[in-house]
Amino acid sequence: LRSLGVSRICRQTVKNILQDENIEPSPTRRRGTWDDYLKAHAETLWACDFFTKRTVSARGIVDLYILVFMHLESREVIVSQSTRKPNSAWVIEQTQAFVEQTEKREHRPTILIHGRDTKFSADFKATLKGRGVKCKKLPVRSPNLNARVERFIQTIKTECLDHFIAFGKDRLDYLVREFAHYYNEARPHSNRDHRPPKDQSSVPEWETIRLAEVVCRE
């Protein structure tokens, strides 16, 4: 207000502005919830996490790791290729690929939620910061705060990976890539009015009739 040349303002005007914006007075103003945070940043908020799949190779049974990124508003997922050694360098490489894939979008990522795994190193954060993406580390023992990514991991396992024996890295990468494509392009999501994540069309308005207009014909 001062920049507009308004030097004095009465208490009632302040009160009216707060009421118009649904802002409670300071003594009763509550802190925002995690759900409030997700909604406020929904268009540009992503989250990531790891999951594993046991595969069969010439060396025997091998656990392979995959990094998944999810856009929390649309539920779109981007998955990495698998690796036996998910070190910090590999995580940075996959993160760079994720940023390159999304940075030209209308709503490019600005915040990335991640867990407390040591593979999310200082170099990982610097890589994102250099691309204009802020990291938000989750509190200790709070997987429920990353529930949407955890739910996708459960979905890909129960609907796809648990039904296959993956013979090697290439086979696993193929399975994950194909399921991610199906998930993004065709699988309905209840939180999106049963539309897949990449379906941006508006929900049609169904025509309704009054009960008195229902006619029974024998």
Each model region followed by its residue ranges:
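Charged DNA-binding/catalytic regions of mobile-element recombinases
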Residues: 1-218
